[in-house]
Amino acid sequence: MAIEEKSTSAEPGPYDALSRFSSLTGEDDRKWWEHTGPVLEKVMRDSGYELQSQYIYLYFVQQHLIPYLGKFPTRGQDDHRWQSNLTPYKVPYELSWNVSHKVVRISWDPVCDASGTENDAFNKKAIHDCTRQLAELDSTVILDRYRLLHKDLVITDEEEQQLLRRDVLPKSGRGQHNLAVDFQEGGITLKVYFYPYMKFLATGTPIEELFFSAIEKLRIADIDEAVGMLKCFLSPKSDDGKPSVDEKVFPSLLACDLCDPSKSRIKYYVIDKWVKWERIANLWTIGGRRLEDPYCAKGLALLKELWDLLAIPEGDRGDIWPNLVLGQPPTHLMTTIANYTLSPASRFPEPQVYLTTFGLNDMAIIDALTAFYERVGFTDMAKSYKKNVQSYYPNLDLNQTNWVHEAVSFSYRNSKPYLSVYYSPF
């Protein structure tokens, strides 16, 4: 029988092996790969991905994602690159980690050479080529809902010209969409996210109307009750006699899975500019409408424990698009975010709350998360989390930084907490 040779430290890992004869020829592409590849390899290894899967996903990133990231961010040159909606520093790449299932996700804002120029002022072009290539690459990627939502939520060429003829728009906040991919079970799960603010400016149609109209056109069976509940909570035009949100809460994103429509979920995102526990609880219970859900109270209790551990200061967050400069630590805190999953699997919109930790001391966040992991039984994660995160940022002192942990998301399904952590790429 064949004798399996043991791996030695001299053998290259997946990142080094794929770098040896890399087809990336552009300087920006090479910088992106050198910056993101080693960290992705470490996170996958720490998540227990098999070696073959590490190769598969690193190759996917190298060949199909890196070419769509545009100019590599350089300090002092923020004006020379696309200002993405995706991250606080307006960088078009974000890595997140579902620590409950140890699944790695990458979000990115597809960019091309024309993005942000007069030839593509709102970065509408690159995503078409990117999604088409991914659909050709993997038969599980289905673009039907992407096309339908794109038609309703992205500005037309005529609307683009109309906006450009107005007073000068800021360069930030112009983005229309971004993508995300989960690396799971040897395959990929692709999602798309739409930002409607430019469509609102161009048409004057309120964002909640844009969203609910787009959802209605998808003709998804058995979600009418959940959609109606969300309308009454979020839209001033609907009323069921129960509390609705105030002007501090507003819609921000609409997302869906790009897969078989029968399995695709819709996610409706909102922002709350007033960060306070009572308001987070209101988002979680949908103004009390979800109290009949058997998972609601148990999830809320755990969310309160996480909130207390993170010790996020309460207050009104003024600017949701702050003018941050890459390389300069943030001096302010950011908003609360929540999304609601709409699917035939539940009569309730299922909430996921994002506690934004950007601007808080990273070591304090590590300690808080470690305590929460211990609380919910993520024993291995509790033991290794601090060491792992320090290895992802070897040149930073996490006792001094306050931007590495961008946010922590929490949901509760099937009697289990689900937690993801979102990391700054720089």
Swiss-Prot record:
Catalysed conversion reaction: 6-hydroxydeoxybrevianamide E + dimethylallyl diphosphate = notoamide S + diphosphate
Transmembrane segments: none
Any matching Pfam family: Trp_DMAT
GO biological process: alkaloid metabolic process
E.C. designation(s): 2.5.1.-
pH dependence (record): Optimum pH is 6-9.
Activity regulation (UniProt): Addition of 5 mM Mg(2+), Ca(2+) or Mn(2+) slightly enhances catalysis (about 100-120%). Significant reduction of enzyme activity (2%-35%) is observed with Cu(2+), Zn(2+), Fe(2+), or Sn(2+) (5 mM).
Organism superkingdom: Eukaryota
Binding site for dimethylallyl diphosphate: 105, 191, 193, 267, 269, 352, 354, 418, 422
Pathway: Alkaloid biosynthesis
Temperature and thermostability: Optimum temperature is 16 to 42 degrees Celsius.
UniProtKB keywords: Alkaloid metabolism, Prenyltransferase, Transferase
UniProt key word Plastid: no
Applied use: Notoamides have been shown to exhibit antitumoral activities. Notoamides A-C show moderate cytotoxicity against HeLa and L1210 cells with IC(50) values in the range of 22-52 mg/ml, but the IC(50) value of notoamide D is greater than 100 mg/ml. Moreover, notoamide C induces G2/M-cell cycle arrest at a concentration of 6.3 mg/ml.
Positions with a binding annotation for substrate: 94, 195
Molecular function GO labels: prenyltransferase activity
Reported function: Prenyltransferase; part of the gene cluster that mediates the biosynthesis of notoamide, a fungal indole alkaloid that belongs to a family of natural products containing a characteristic bicyclo[2.2.2]diazaoctane core. The first step of notoamide biosynthesis involves coupling of L-proline and L-tryptophan by the bimodular NRPS notE, to produce cyclo-L-tryptophan-L-proline called brevianamide F.
Protein family: Belongs to the tryptophan dimethylallyltransferase family.
The name this protein goes by in its record: 6-Hydroxy-7-prenyldeoxybrevianamide E synthase notC
